[in-house]
Amino acid sequence: MIRQEVLHAVLDPKAVHFKQFWLSSVDRDESELLEVLCFGNYGDLNAIQSCEEWKDAIESKLRTLTLLGLCEVPSELEYDQAMASCCIPDDVILEQRMVELQAQVHFQLDSVGRRIKVLRCLGARDIYNGERPLLLLRDAARSRESTLAGLRQWKQKLQYQLR
C-alpha cells in the first residue's frame, strides 16, 4: 500500500526528491516505485508493475526527473537528445517541461537551433549510496561512486588548465 504522503509527493509538480520516502518504505510496491523515482529514468517506467491508477502522474514525474538528470551535466542539450530520453513527441511539450523545471534549472531555450543551454543547475537527482538493495534497477546511474569519479575528473581538468 502506497502511503498518502508518497502519493502527494508524486503528484506535486515541484517534488524531485524521494529518497527519504524510499529509505523508510516497507511495502514492496511502494519501494519499487520510489526506487525508480529516486534512481531511474523515463526508460525504467515499465519496470513499475503496480500503481496503474497513477501511471500518468508517474510517467509525467519520470519525464521531469529524466530532464533534470540531463541538465545536471552538459552545458548544452540538444532537443533531439532530450526528447528521445523522455519520449517527448514535439518541441512545444519539451519547452513546457523545461519551464516546469525553472526552480531547479536556469536555462536558455534556442527554439530555432533546437538547443537548451543550461546556465546553472540548482537541483540534482537523488544519489544511491548502497543504503539498501535495489529491487528493480540493476544499477543506479547516479551513485556515490559515479559522483566521486565525476568530481575527480573535474578536479584533474581544473588542475590541467591551471598548469
Swiss-Prot record:
InterPro entries: Csn9_fungi. The keyword Kinase does not apply. It comes from the Eukaryota. Residues 5-120 form the PCI domain. GO terms for biological process: cellular response to pheromone; conjugation with cellular fusion; protein deneddylation. Component of the COP9 signalosome (CSN) complex that acts as a regulator of the ubiquitin (Ubl) conjugation pathway by mediating the deneddylation of the cullin subunit of SCF-type E3 ubiquitin-protein ligase complexes. The complex is involved in the regulation of the mating pheromone response. This is COP9 signalosome complex subunit 9.
